[in-house]
């Protein structure tokens, strides 16, 4: 009957009204069948693209509107309006449907976060808590700026763990601990931060093979990076036994100070967590969660396991066989996996079996030469350094931004480049790299079996390629690894020629692209620097701790920059020359490198001398007496002028003679050069760390510095007669430090609101007088917290937008989505997305 109806329709009159009426009659016949079968269309598919479900629903609505046209007197006008509506309504309805989906999607996510946070604050403050202003949720990525909508279900349900917890493999569990058995070649993925204890068997974790020992390994697994995979590689009776414990490192507190740290740890309890917490209360939370798939995450984030490609694993095994003779340079394009490969190789070298195949035991540690000032591994941005490491590290760089007072490693020497890319001053960069290499050769005298890993930045084109090939020829390497099989040829060929000339094997490995990155490079740098300033390393414990005290409330280091007790020898501004009148504005609120100058002739191109002497050393001795606050233990009263002798520096070329005092503030402006400032010579200077200039007190000629540099490190530098110079580079502005008070105030207000909501539930058991008194107190506290937020939002250089309209939300959503990066895996890469 349907075919017959279609044939009759084809022979109908061709007038516009007749054709329109025939289509309306056909729609009336088809509509009941559509409703019964719930299908978008019953006719054969046309040449046009297939409708999405929203467009199909909109077209049905449009057809329904067309059927209400009944009056013949206005049939031509109605026919015109209906045809326009039939063409425009599907697009408008589809757009409206998409807009409604985009607005409704974050709603359950926010609700889950608030409910979970309330329960967590009641028990123990160890997990995520929203403070109202955070980064865009991963669920919002379903809009898809580059990826099609069909990829979203796959992204949100990615397999993570092969092991499924049950009664047979759970040894025991309580509110803080989970002990499980993992079969060989099976994996387990955890989200959060925890302490790992290997009790039986051998497991692999981020390149390290961990054997049974009494040691606890601290593991940080945030959602900002691919999650570490715990894999059983050998077991007793085919199983390995591990114990995972909650830890209170304090790093979760940073979410109160920055939205970049929000929603990066575990959320609500997963199904596996509930299975292991049956005997505990419903509000019990651990600092970690067991995930089977990415859909187990209550916040629907894009989670991925950290898997290595087969070629990576074989290359790591081959390189580790060289033992103490290994000196490898790892280079490649940006985002090719250089840091990941370096971290895996480092952990593999630091955790060999008790007796390896080549009878090599790593007792001398591993030297790590980091030449990437933009994304360093063990220091804040803007530095290149040589580190001596003795234990594996499990976590992204912002979980170990410094090795000061660490038992797992130390910084041998560091140089402040002052930029995130070495292309700004390649000469200074190369000299710093060569000086660090000389320090490694000196380290071999004490640790002859210490291998070397060199991490080169993604600056591999143009002048960066020339620097890379020169390093290959000059550093005496044993291996070169290039992290890309796709070239380009103009990079691989010169690199291969340089390796061939130096008689060094060149290994080419496939890059490991990431499907989703939730933080941009600039945001990761901000997280790392903020972690650097809030981290402390108490001597009583093995692992570091983080505090959520804002920078404005931290105790500063007060030092004189002029007068008889001068502690700062000079202030250098890298890059183009600025007027001395602008030095105050350039320095106030900036990040500066604290550099110890080992010679008065420390400017690039000058002769080296033994050290500061005469009046310079006496000034340094007196200047140390005014160091107070965070480094109050620094005292130079025991240092005498005779400790280093009297070696008269050359007045025409010494640092002291190159200082110009600013006319208004009397700041010691150190500038040498023509047009741009010559940097300090790496052979005569050493960077101690970073500091934030909180204020400049002009009447008293003092600087207030916030710095995590240990006081013992400053004292040692001053006792050796070194002068302290502050170097103002071209690093990212510390906007995170300006907004910390605002986010802390918001977090305090939300915490108070949660306590008030909890107290209201308990008012039924009290009399009315007590309830009224509590309400008055709560109202006063709320008013004080609102005033605190108001004052924190009025600081300079920051604008708080309170507009919560739909237009503002959409604009903010588009702006935050700009840094959501996607990199597709190419066919044959064997990466996790090439399935």
UniProtKB/Swiss-Prot annotation:
Acidic residues bias: where? 114-127
Q: Where is this region: Disordered?
A: 1-132, 608-658, 758-777
Ranges of biased composition (kind: Basic and acidic residues)? 758-772
The cellular component terms of Gene Ontology attached to this UniProt record, alphabetical and capped at eight, are:
nucleolus
Entry EC no(s): 2.7.1.-
Gene Ontology biological process terms in this record: cleavage in ITS2 between 5.8S rRNA and LSU-rRNA of tricistronic rRNA transcript (SSU-rRNA, 5.8S rRNA, LSU-rRNA); rRNA processing
Where are the compositionally biased (Low complexity) regions? 91-105
Annotated residues that bind ATP are located at 332-339
Cite the record's Polar residues compositional bias ranges.
649-658
Q: Where in the cell is it found?
A: Nucleus, Nucleolus
The enzyme's first-digit EC class, named in words, is transferase
Q: Which keywords are on file for this protein?
A: ATP-binding, Kinase, Nucleotide-binding, Nucleus, rRNA processing, Transferase
One GO molecular function term of this record is: ATP binding
UniProt superkingdom? Eukaryota
Say what the protein does: Polynucleotide 5'-kinase involved in rRNA processing.
The family classification in the record reads: Belongs to the Clp1 family. NOL9/GRC3 subfamily.
Q: What is this protein called?
A: Polynucleotide 5'-hydroxyl-kinase grc3
Q: Which organism is it from?
A: Neosartorya fischeri (strain ATCC 1020 / DSM 3700 / CBS 544.65 / FGSC A1164 / JCM 1740 / NRRL 181 / WB 181)
